[in-house]
Amino acid sequence: MLIGRVVGNLVATQKYAKLEGTRLLLVQPLDLAGKDRGTTILAIDGVDAGPGDRVLVVQDGRAAQLVLGKGTSAVDAAVVGVVDAVDLQG
């Protein structure tokens, strides 16, 4: 899993049938300090996240499929939560 920020969405008028009705988000991975790290990833939105939201992303394909209830569909990453706060102090 990783924490990221939604930086945009991707519109696909044609896509795999099992992905019909899903939203595709562009997510910028963040480090624990909230700084950008790595390259932007594409993830299916499972929680109705929006631009600027900090989100929790699962990148294991099988886990993403299970969380979204998409069975054997071609899912690589999924947004599974909106992050309210990160507490590094414990």
Outline where the language-model segments fall.
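Pocket-edge structural micro-motifs
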Residues: 28-29, 45, 59
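C-terminal structural segments of small proteins and small subunits
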Residues: 56-90
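Short, flexible, glycine/charge-rich loop motifs used to bind or transfer phosphoryl groups or to couple energy/partner
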Residues: 15, 45, 69
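N-terminal first-folded block
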Residues: 1-35
